[in-house]
Swiss-Prot record:
Pfam families: bCoV_lipid_BD (PF09399). Belongs to the coronavirus group 2 protein 9b family. GO terms for molecular function: identical protein binding. GO terms for cellular component: host cell cytoplasmic vesicle membrane; host cell endoplasmic reticulum; host cell mitochondrion; host cell nucleus; mitochondrial outer membrane; outer mitochondrial membrane protein complex; virion component. The gene encoding this protein is included within the N gene (alternative ORF). It comes from Severe acute respiratory syndrome coronavirus (SARS-CoV). This is ORF9b protein. One of its GO terms (biological process) is negative regulation of defense response to virus. It is found in: Virion; Host cytoplasmic vesicle membrane; Host cytoplasm; Host endoplasmic reticulum. Residues 9-98 form the 9b domain.
Amino acid sequence: MDPNQTNVVPPALHLVDPQIQLTITRMEDAMGQGQNSADPKVYPIILRLGSQLSLSMARRNLDSLEARAFQSTPIVVQMTKLATTEELPDEFVVVTAK
């Protein structure tokens, strides 16, 4: 057994790379309008260190990339692949971690 693997950390705590990309499924999109095949949207994340772990939606505008955070939006998160900050779409995810 590898001694480096004795402490198992939940996957959510592995969000330590600002280039990680997440698949976001908004619950209102998945359940609204009676649609059974709502496709998840993929957003890169922006990682912020120094505060409690949280996840929220944010929209890009002309003033700030962090404007209009939607912290109350229920979402389902799945890590997918790496992305660069240049690939940020109009909507992205802001992650804060201790």
